[in-house]
């Protein structure tokens, strides 16, 4: 008897010629380097990067949290493949100086690696 196992499939593959960031746990692509906005963010487990857009990421329900820069409505994001929580999405910023974060994504360095062309 042959045991069949389900292979891992990803929703999106980023082009191999680009520098990409991947989930450290399962290697699913998460973001293209061109989508990186800032490396100067702090996550709940250390340093984090702010991205304009991401792939292969699911989003939980939004909730209000007081972060280092004030009150925000954020939703936890997780890897669609391995379900590891990666960071969060900024849904709403209550401070006018923080509005640029709305719709953007935080991924903690503890959960991603650099792939392709580094």
From Swiss-Prot:
Residues reported in the UniProt entry to bind Zn(2+)? 23, 26, 79, 82
Gene Ontology CC: nucleus
InterPro entries this protein is in?
Yippee, Yippee/Mis18/Cereblon, Yippee_fam
What residue stretches are annotated with the Yippee domain?
19-116
GO terms for MF: metal ion binding
Q: Which Pfam families match?
A: Yippee-Mis18
Q: Which UniProt keywords apply?
A: Metal-binding, Nucleus, Zinc
Location comes to: Nucleus
Q: Does the keyword NADP apply?
A: no
Report whether Metal-binding shows up as a keyword of the record. yes
The Swiss-Prot or TrEMBL record describes its family as follows:
Belongs to the yippee family.
Q: What does this protein do?
A: May play a role in epithelioid conversion of fibroblasts.
Record protein name field? Protein yippee-like 1
User: Which species does the entry assign this protein to?
Assistant: Mus musculus
> In the UniProt record, what gene is named as encoding this protein?
Ypel1
